[in-house]
């Protein structure tokens, strides 16, 4: 994503994406931060909108959770608020919305209204961001990313496990569980 700001602001943006996504179970392949742009490359467990029609009939509950987590990950740099301008993140959220609206009723399972799912994603980001230590830890992570420039999966995993994950993990209510993520098909070839 191109951001008109300092390398630190770019790094903070990407830190929020990568930390929130990792906290809900997505795997990072690489993180790139440059002077005016950055991006996170996700592994195959981060969904793409084109997969929803295939995933939904197989496991509607897990697909709903997967999409909520993916959309929240895209919203995370904005702290749960609306996108200030049109950007790659907002375009991808809109693509998820279009794909979601096209899902059929399956065995009585009706996709929840998109705006409800979107509100839940916004609320999840706000709740995560307000956990003790998250905002400060994200700033520290952003400084690390700005200095490093690029992290591969192994470097990110080491950082997450040793330094940042303890503060940035999602708090889960006792007894709560997350449905298993559906198997992913490769639709990009």
Predicted regions and their residues:
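Soluble catalytic regions of large protease machineries
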Residues: 2-189
């Amino acid at each position: 994503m191109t951001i008109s700001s300092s390398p630190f602001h770019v790094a903070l943006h990407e830190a929020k994406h990568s930390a929130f996504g990792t906290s809900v179970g997505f795997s990072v392949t690489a993180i790139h931060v440059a002077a005016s742009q950055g991006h996170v490359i996700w592994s195959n467990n981060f969904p793409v909108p084109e997969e929803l029609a295939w995933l939904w009939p197989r496991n509607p509950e897990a697909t709903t959770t997967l999409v909520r987590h993916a959309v929240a990950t895209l919203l995370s740099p904005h702290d749960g608020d609306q996108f200030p301008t049109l950007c790659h993140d907002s375009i991808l959220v809109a693509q998820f919305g279009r794909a979601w609206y096209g899902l059929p009723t399956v065995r009585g399972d009706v996709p929840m209204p998109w705006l409800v799912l979107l509100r839940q994603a916004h609320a999840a980001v706000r709740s995560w961001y307000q956990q003790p230590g998250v905002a400060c830890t994200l700033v520290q992570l952003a400084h690390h990313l700005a200095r490093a420039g690029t992290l591969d999966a192994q470097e990110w995993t080491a950082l997450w496990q040793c330094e940042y994950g303890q503060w940035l993990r999602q708090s889960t209510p006792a007894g709560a569980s997350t449905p298993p993520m559906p198997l992913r098909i490769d639709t990009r070839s």
